[in-house]
């Protein structure tokens, strides 16, 4: 089993979780191929983390299965934009931590 972790990525955790659920339990090679055609920013990020987890384990992507793909919320960057009458309203810029575990596929299947 090998792991990869990407922290403080400027990405909404809610939107990233939608993509993470899609690849859980998939073959790593198939997961990377399917993420390539998704239009989301999260798809590109998660694809890189899966590739990193496969490389960390020293196995081929065709022999690896995504055991878990988890997206946790990181700190929220708060910025302010000026509004009318001297006021300011906050802009929230959420960050995420992406965690991927990859296991080698059993040979008997």
From Swiss-Prot:
| Single biological process term from Gene Ontology | translation
Gene Ontology molecular function terms on file = rRNA binding; structural constituent of ribosome
Which GO CC annotations does the UniProt entry carry? cytosolic large ribosomal subunit
Write the record's keywords in alphabetical order, separated by commas.
Answer: Ribonucleoprotein, Ribosomal protein, RNA-binding, rRNA-binding
Task: Write down the InterPro entries for this protein, in alphabetical order.
Answer: Ribosomal_uL22, Ribosomal_uL22_bac/chlpt-type, Ribosomal_uL22_bac/org-type, Ribosomal_uL22_CS, Ribosomal_uL22_sf
Note whether Oxidoreductase occurs among the keywords: no
Pfam families hit by this protein: Ribosomal_L22
Would the keyword Ribosomal protein turn up in this protein's UniProt record?
yes
Quaternary state and interactors? Part of the 50S ribosomal subunit.
Query: According to its UniProt record, which protein family does this protein belong to?
Result: Belongs to the universal ribosomal protein uL22 family.
HAMAP family tied to this protein: Ribosomal_uL22_B (MF_01331_B)
Q: What does this protein do?
A: This protein binds specifically to 23S rRNA; its binding is stimulated by other ribosomal proteins, e.g. L4, L17, and L20. It is important during the early stages of 50S assembly. It makes multiple contacts with different domains of the 23S rRNA in the assembled 50S subunit and ribosome. The globular domain of the protein is located near the polypeptide exit tunnel on the outside of the subunit, while an extended beta-hairpin is found that lines the wall of the exit tunnel in the center of the 70S ribosome.
This one is known as Large ribosomal subunit protein uL22
Naturally occurring in which organism (per UniProt)? Wolinella succinogenes (strain ATCC 29543 / DSM 1740 / CCUG 13145 / JCM 31913 / LMG 7466 / NCTC 11488 / FDC 602W)
């Amino acid at each position: 089993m090998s792991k990869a972790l990407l922290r403080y990525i400027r990405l909404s955790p809610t939107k990233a979780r939608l993509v993470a659920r899609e690849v859980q339990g998939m073959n790593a090679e198939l997961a990377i191929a399917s993420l390539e055609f998704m239009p989301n920013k999260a798809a590109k990020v998660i694809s890189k983390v899966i590739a990193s987890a496969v490389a960390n384990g020293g196995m081929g992507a065709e022999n690896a299965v995504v055991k878990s793909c988890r997206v946790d919320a990181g700190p929220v960057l708060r910025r302010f934009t000026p509004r009318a009458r001297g006021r300011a309203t906050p802009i929230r810029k959420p960050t995420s931590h992406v965690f991927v575990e990859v296991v080698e596929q059993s040979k008997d299947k």
